[in-house]
């Protein structure tokens, strides 16, 4: 990738991250345990809140990247992940398919993500998450998640890494408010806790 193209990608990502942040600015802490802080924000025009989880891990960005790029293996630490596979990998971009467990009586969900990885000049790593529901035909027995907008960000802090996981999802179909409200706290907290356990081994 040429320097101009790389600059264009970086600028584009900055705009995308800024738009995500603009949609969800008024963060309120919902849970702060085990060194993991989960905050929620209303998103204009959506019935579902955005979530943000932040924690410090005694690990390296290289190890975190390896754990994330092992797409099928990552299912063991992603909250309520049933199965996950890599559909396509091309340079700094990849496409993944995930099936999720859901509590009865909610129909199981699946999602297709376009992941763009950007290495920052400061040693940070950002993985932009974008839902692409039409990338694959819908699977029988699953409701396709209609929108995913978020990112992972890893920032070196001495011998630790600050990890931020922020997402806003439109899950498709109908979800009881009690289930949705529980998910937006459990998803970042449990995902970060499980990732931390593996990253710090």
Where are these regions (language model features)?
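Bacterial N-terminal signal peptides that target proteins for export
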Residues: 1-11
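Repetitive helical segments and hydrophobic/amphipathic motifs
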Residues: 14-15
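N-terminal signal peptide c-region/cleavage motif recognized by signal peptidases
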Residues: 19-21
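Eukaryotic helix-grip
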Residues: 23-201
């Amino acid at each position: 990738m040429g320097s101009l193209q790389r600059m264009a990608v970086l600028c584009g990502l900055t705009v995308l991250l800024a738009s995500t942040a603009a949609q969800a600015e008024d963060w309120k802490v919902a849970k702060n345990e085990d060194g993991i802080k989960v905050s929620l924000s209303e998103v204009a025009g959506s019935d579902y809140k955005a979530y943000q989880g932040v924690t410090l891990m005694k690990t390296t960005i290289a190890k975190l990247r390896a754990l994330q790029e092992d797409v099928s293996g990552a299912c063991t630490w992603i909250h309520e992940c049933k199965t996950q596979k890599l559909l396509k990998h091309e340079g700094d971009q990849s496409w993944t398919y995930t099936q999720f467990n859901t509590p009865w009586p909610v129909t199981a969900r699946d999602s297709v993500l376009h992941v763009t990885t950007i290495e920052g000049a400061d040693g940070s790593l950002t993985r932009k998450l974008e839902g692409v529901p039409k990338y694959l035909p819908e699977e029988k027995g699953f409701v396709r998640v209609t929108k995913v907008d978020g990112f992972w960000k890893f920032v070196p802090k001495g011998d630790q890494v600050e990890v931020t996981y922020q997402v806003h999802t439109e899950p498709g179909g109908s979800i009881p408010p009690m289930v949705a409200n529980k998910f937006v706290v459990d998803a970042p907290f449990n995902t970060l806790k499980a990732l931390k356990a593996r990253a710090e081994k």
